[in-house]
């Protein structure tokens, strides 16, 4: 008889009921965001390819903001530098909470999505680089490294309604880790001229913000100015301003201190802030950025062919569709192979393949990195946008085919996960 301590770890095992309910709420918000993102993308593409495309370009180029603070930015810059800072703030809160108080505080559960995210970043970057060694577009190597969680979950909402919660959680965590890795890449690889003085000065409001939230201060009139000042100084330093969103998120405590009653007294400020800011991120920040970045003049089938003949666009398509699938699937398999773990009962490796394909739905962060690599509005950036859109649609269709084949098995698992024959609070399983 096996010692309980030596029982094999199961990949994608069900988490706690409380964590399952929390994740379900997040997934609902992200699915709504995905619908808005798709609508914004269609609107932008339609406008950019209409006889009134000039008005779209004029709108994006409109400057506003305090010039004295060097913040007289265009609408497109505000969307990329300002609104996406909110998106990364929420992503940072979610990631910190998962690893401090969620099911992923258990290293045996955290290793799979973290390793899969790393593989899903490394392999696309390598494939893109190999295709662009001599094309002059090597600077865009990071474009196919990101997964768009809102877009991916909107696909799941249509084709995988009964997908086991553990698989949804895996995809969510993978995408969040993916986004945080992208922020590190942006900070390191896409920072131009670095101004040390504003960067050092940003430490002051960041430290004040940290001190206040650690003391459980919620007053927006204190915290918001400090957050905005931190963002403005990071922006002035030359580091991409979205980095400020992650730094602020990591400063927020997840658990209550002992002086505030300890973890048993209720959630910390991270969950409070997440509830406040996630709707703004999901319903405003991501869709508006998509509207500002996805509007590219395609020019019919001929224009589509010309765009995809650019090695940069081709590298993006191969990186997202092929590289993501190989990186996520292979890394997950290797973790299972070298740890002796096995899949949860009822699941098969084809399920992991479906999620790996869905990881190739890259949009928001891929478009952002494309703009940073080649400059917004440049011909190559437009080609990259076409590549991102083509790859995302292709990956979504391939994932749909794979996941549809398993819907009957998912329905059986869903029935077991949600059965409540004893009519108590929560399923029997």
UniProtKB/Swiss-Prot annotation:
Keywords for this protein: Antiport, Cell membrane, Ion transport, Membrane, Sodium, Sodium transport, Transmembrane, Transmembrane helix, Transport
Presence of the UniProt keyword Disulfide bond in the record: no
Coiled-coil regions, chain positions: none
GO CC terms, sorted: plasma membrane
Entry's localization field: Cell membrane
Biological process according to GO: regulation of pH
Described purpose of this protein according to its UniProt entry: Na(+)/H(+) antiporter that extrudes sodium in exchange for external protons.
HAMAP family to which the protein is assigned, alphabetical: NhaA
Similarity comment: Belongs to the NhaA Na(+)/H(+) (TC 2.A.33) antiporter family.
Protein name: Na(+)/H(+) antiporter NhaA 1
Organism listed in the record: Frankia alni (strain DSM 45986 / CECT 9034 / ACN14a)
Gene: nhaA1
